[in-house]
Amino acid sequence: MSTTTTASIEGYKLGKVIIEGKTKQVYDLPEQPGLCLLLSKDRITAGDGVKAHDLAGKAEISNTTNGQVFRLLNEAGIRTAYVKQCGAKAFIARKCQMIPIEWVTRRLATGSFLKRNVGVPEGYRFSPPKQETFFKDDANHDPQWSEEQIVSAKFELNGLVIGQDEVDIMRRTTLLVFEILERAWQTKNCALIDMKVEFGICDDGNIVLADIIDSDSWRLWPAGDKRLMVDKQVYRNLASVTASDLDTVKRNFIWVAEQLADIVPKKDHLVVILMGSASDISHSEKIATSCRSLGLNVELRVSSAHKGPEETLRIVREYESVMSNLIFVAVAGRSNGLGPVVSGSTNYPVINCPPVKSDNMQVDVWSSLNLPSGLGCATVLYPEAAALHAATILGLGNFMVWSKLRVKALNNFITLKKADKELRGVRNA
């Protein structure tokens, strides 16, 4: 596609149409190198475009839905091409070359999976979620491909050849994207049944989640009830399509967009870092920095359980009275009375993270480990470990904290994959 336009959207001058699909156009942005603009259409299709109808307002709804989805994924730390919304019907994205593979993740067996896997009952639950890949080819109805076929195709995009390492990265990322959105929708008592995503390769050679994620991309069942579905399957199931039917589909899509806008990660938690002395500030700040990187709210206080036990307990009661999701991190060297005293006085989790040094570690850490019976505080040595432990606890009730932890693990996996790929190979003497 090489048509050009002189139009602009929200001050962004549109260049040539890079590609046009059934429901969107992708424009070059000549004044914004490395970026492009995706403009949605008021169009709904199914069956590789065999069924298609105009649907006034769909472009705006789709764009809003997509923006809310990528808001959550970007906040979690997933690497995406999405930059920002641009007007009612468009958004700005990093320019990338798309990998022609559609990644599908399924929590429950339904739809085309049942036709391809005769004998599997509808509603069969996949744990972990089932993953499938399809080669994007409308003429052949997007045939299912194996992992071996993807690797053997040797797609080369922006200088990167898609091999086993890249497939592994996309597979892990796809699964995590599904699980993040699944947990987000659980806060609205909605079950994410399955969804599809695509990836692209940016100019820097990195794999990013790309394209659009909207109500065309998933199956969504409120209260886990298929009869209440609010996704494009409602349109797919129509033998004949009336204006009233299209209005129902549109109302469903609006409902989805409104629910997504209301999914806001909770901030009803606090990690209180209690240090026995102001001299422990450096160690405590490292804990706080790690906590904030995981989306945790933090406060730092100074109180000595040895020199001022009454004040220590007053501080504990102060936070207990205003916060239900609360964790105390005790930072005290030498004889650590702070953590055990707090642990014996509260039902909230207490994590000891003493600022020990290599020359006195075995002596000083013992007071945090050899505790009287009835105390359940944990002990870690490193600031990041204290933050990770706190996040693991709070993530049980906060999907965004849980998501940030999982993304951190994913990024570790990707870093190791890339390092191994770079160093791999036989070295002769």
From Swiss-Prot:
It catalyses: 5-amino-1-(5-phospho-D-ribosyl)imidazole-4-carboxylate + L-aspartate + ATP = (2S)-2-[5-amino-1-(5-phospho-beta-D-ribosyl)imidazole-4-carboxamido]succinate + ADP + phosphate + 2 H(+); 5-amino-1-(5-phospho-D-ribosyl)imidazole-4-carboxylate + H(+) = 5-amino-1-(5-phospho-beta-D-ribosyl)imidazole + CO2. The keyword ATP-binding applies. GO terms for molecular function: ATP binding; phosphoribosylaminoimidazole carboxylase activity; phosphoribosylaminoimidazolesuccinocarboxamide synthase activity. Keywords: ATP-binding, Decarboxylase, Ligase, Lyase, Multifunctional enzyme, Nucleotide-binding, Purine biosynthesis. It comes from the Eukaryota. Residues 7-264 are annotated as: SAICAR synthetase. Pathway: Purine metabolism; IMP biosynthesis via de novo pathway; 5-amino-1-(5-phospho-D-ribosyl)imidazole-4-carboxamide from 5-amino-1-(5-phospho-D-ribosyl)imidazole-4-carboxylate: step 1/2; Purine metabolism; IMP biosynthesis via de novo pathway; 5-amino-1-(5-phospho-D-ribosyl)imidazole-4-carboxylate from 5-amino-1-(5-phospho-D-ribosyl)imidazole (carboxylase route): step 1/1. Residues 270-429 are annotated as: AIR carboxylase domain. One of its GO terms (cellular component) is cytosol. CO2 binds at S335. Pfam families: AIRC, SAICAR_synt. Gene3D superfamilies: 3.40.50.1970, ATP-grasp fold, B domain, Phosphorylase Kinase, domain 1. Residues 7-264 are annotated as: SAICAR synthetase domain. GO terms for biological process: 'de novo' IMP biosynthetic process. Residues 265-429 are annotated as: AIR carboxylase. SUPFAM superfamilies: N5-CAIR mutase (phosphoribosylaminoimidazole carboxylase, PurE), SAICAR synthase-like. Its EC number is 6.3.2.6, 4.1.1.21. Bifunctional phosphoribosylaminoimidazole carboxylase and phosphoribosylaminoimidazole succinocarboxamide synthetase catalyzing two reactions of the de novo purine biosynthetic pathway. In the N-terminal section; belongs to the SAICAR synthetase family. In the C-terminal section; belongs to the AIR carboxylase family. Class II subfamily. NCBIfam families: purE. Homooctamer. This is Bifunctional phosphoribosylaminoimidazole carboxylase/phosphoribosylaminoimidazole succinocarboxamide synthetase. It comes from Drosophila melanogaster.
